[in-house]
Amino acid sequence: MAAAVQRGLPVAGGGESSESEDDGWEIGYLDRASQKLTSPLPTEEKNEIFKKALTTGDISLVEELLDSGISVESSFRYGWTPLMYAASVANVELVRVLLDRGANASFEKDKHTVLITACSARGSQEQILKCVELLLSRNADPNVACRRLMTPIMYAARDGHPQVVALLVAQGAEVNAQDENGYTALTWAARQGHKNVVLKLLELGANKMLQTKDGKTPSEVANKNKHPEIFSLLSLTLNPLEGKLQQLTKEETICKLLTTDSDKEKDYIFSSYAAFGDLEIFLYGLGLEHMTDLLKERDISLRHLLTMRKDEFSKNGIASRDQQKILAALKELAVEEIKFGELPEVAKLEISGDEFLSFLLKLNKQCGHLITAVQNIITELPVSSHKIVLEWASPQNFTSVCEELVSNVEDLSEEVCKLKDLIQKLQNERENDPTHIPSVEEASPWRSRILKRTAVTVCGFGFLLFICKLTFQRK
């Protein structure tokens, strides 16, 4: 044989399994000294050299062999053509050369197309994207399915390539096609845990309610395969990204969807479009997405919206029916608070000790509820930012609110300490009054302990909010 194989680092073959080394793809490197054809060779030897040149990606030798008469549609074991192999390893230049030499971009073997091979190739997303783009430019059909009825977009979604998915849809791929098990591209992405692909498919109009043959939606498939972030994302009441790009022309879609960051190693956590924030999520969940532009024009944040009074709704042009939806949602979201009722008129001399004690007990209980609420928030917060499913507002907004909370708690602590000192002063004066006869109740220090406990609770709440503030700043 004119080209001896020199064993070295392994190079991916064509994926076939063979019983003899002579029938399949060789794994290895060509001897560099034997790459030039110095004399005519038998066809069988040329085919072997051709396979090895494809294996090593030796484009110059491939071109030389094609010039010598080797067919660009040569059929190797299992019926694979050179283009099929080049696509399987995402060798962009080799795919380009073979296509320029007349290779059939629509070739298929047992319903396995070159395009499907490229979408499921071993390689980086950038390489796969370029190969797919080349094949589509030569009229490869993005909707031809394999024997399992899986289309190229399903393979791209399964393997986690959002830009390939976007390109296929831009070239006419059916985003909601289903395979033999009822899986769509969205179902495959949810099953494999590819959040960036899920977001991209939602932008492109994927229907998240389509069920598999066993009756499961993509969100249920994600939950079954232990992908809680995707499960939460797909469980939103409405889909704010659905159909976002359907009105664009093909050229506009390609231009927008193929815009990518120059950092190739970047984790595509979100799509190339800005992800939706907390205000959008709240509005879409209530079916009030039409209010998004209005609120943004008036620079109304979610926090502002949730604290608006009824007259403010009208001033900002919010319709009565929309007001009712927001107020109903606020009623559901509102944390039950302990109402103090009418505070005792402490200035009056006839105020009873029981009334005043009741007020202090309610204040202490309220502080306890607040401490529990903050503890729950700290427990539930993700430990790292990449675990957050939906985009948050600037962390500065959160830390500023925490700073206000800490300041208010410090003020509250200071006022409670003043109250404690005042009560203690009154108590001391009363004890020193020679005309005063202490009652049995006064002999017991339990009321004093309650006051001390209230003061300690308030101080503890202040410390807890300080820790919460540090946690937000660190995130």
Swiss-Prot record:
Alphabetized InterPro entries for the sequence: Ankyrin_rpt, Ankyrin_rpt-contain_sf, Asz1_SAM, SAM, SAM/pointed_sf
The UniProt keywords, alphabetically, are: ANK repeat, Cytoplasm, Developmental protein, Differentiation, Meiosis, Phosphoprotein, Repeat, RNA-mediated gene silencing, Spermatogenesis
Q: Is Protease there in the keyword field?
A: no
Subcellular location(s) per record: Cytoplasm
Q: Which residues carry this modification: Phosphoserine?
A: 17-18, 20
ANK repeat ranges, renumbered to this chain: 45-74, 78-107, 110-144, 148-177, 181-210, 214-243
Q: Which GO terms describe its cellular component?
A: pi-body
Region (Disordered) residue spans = 1-24
Which residue numbers delimit the SAM domain? 272-334
What's a GO biological-process term for it?
spermatogenesis
Highest taxon listed in the record's lineage:
Eukaryota
Return the Pfam families for the record.
Ank (PF00023), Ank_2 (PF12796), SAM_2 (PF07647)
Read off the PANTHER family from this record: ANKYRIN REPEAT, SAM AND BASIC LEUCINE ZIPPER DOMAIN-CONTAINING PROTEIN 1 (PTHR24157:SF3)
- Give the record's subunit note: Interacts with DDX4, PIWIL1, RANBP9 and TDRD1.
Q: Any idea what job this protein has?
A: Plays a central role during spermatogenesis by repressing transposable elements and preventing their mobilization, which is essential for the germline integrity. Acts via the piRNA metabolic process, which mediates the repression of transposable elements during meiosis by forming complexes composed of piRNAs and Piwi proteins and governs the methylation and subsequent repression of transposons. Its association with pi-bodies suggests a participation in the primary piRNAs metabolic process.
Identification of the protein by name: Ankyrin repeat, SAM and basic leucine zipper domain-containing protein 1
